[in-house]
Amino acid sequence: MIVRTWNLFHGNTVPPGKRRYVQEMVRLVTHDAPDFVCFQEVPPWALDQLEGWSGMHVFGQVAARPTIGPLPSTTELGRRLTDLHPGLFRSGFEGQANAILVTRERTILARYVLTLNSLGFRLREGRRLGLPLLTRLAWAKERRQCLAVRLDGGLVVSNLHATNARHPRVPDAEVARAAGWTLGLAGDEPCILAGDFNVDTARSVVIDHLDGFSNAGPGVDHILVRGASAGPYDRWTPERRRLGKLALSDHAPVEVVVE
């Protein structure tokens, strides 16, 4: 099984510009029919398009809803405002979503969602970790979630997008929570935990000690496997995601072959 994860950066490029390439990114990373693809930072309006662009089953969920300042907005208005300058506004108006794409050769039996930075969890972990007040307040700024699907045969695949915080214990806490949740869903069956962990192994005190999971690779984008054999990390070279003089996203896709 080919498993990939990619933070789409809202369809933006490096360097950022006034055009987005969400469709091009989705088609690029799914053109050779991988088994599973986990996306983070998907524009919410694009969720309805993913199935047509990829030819895969899709489970998507909006994590951060569209807003204009403190006021709620709509998906379409968020898109229109963001399209004025996507590289500048990013998710400021339209929010962001996550998605798991599954080959049509498999059947999704169940779908699950976990809010990683729920209020009770933040309060409890903030006290336990002794986090500064400003760090605790910032932790609540944007809802972060982990999605999971249960497939025919029992395999569970989870996709998380952890909080991007200066203090590495914040994403660590969310990663540990997502891992424990995934293990609980899977029971004795194999499971995969993929996504943008927003912390690398050099700063994390959690990633290398998750119960039963395979070793993480470099960077903040990871694919961890339990109960199956995982091949080496394949982090795409810049050339594989280049469009002219532009690099698609500020993250490279990561893939692992699972047997």
Where would I find each of the regions flagged by the language model?
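Active-site-proximal beta-strand elements of phosphoester/diester hydrolases
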Residues: 1-14, 112-115, 154-164
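Soluble or luminal CAZymes and related metallo-dependent hydrolases
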Residues: 17-24, 42, 93, 139-143, ...
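Short, glycine/charged-enriched secondary-structure capping and boundary segments
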Residues: 18-20, 51-54, 73-74, 172-173, ...
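Structured beta-strand-rich core segments of catalytic domains in phosphoester-bond hydrolases
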Residues: 36, 42-153, 237-238
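Metal-dependent phosphoester-hydrolase catalytic domains
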Residues: 106-112, 168-169, 173-176, 180-192, ...
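Short, catalytically relevant binding-site loops at active-site mouths
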Residues: 117-120, 163-167, 198-200
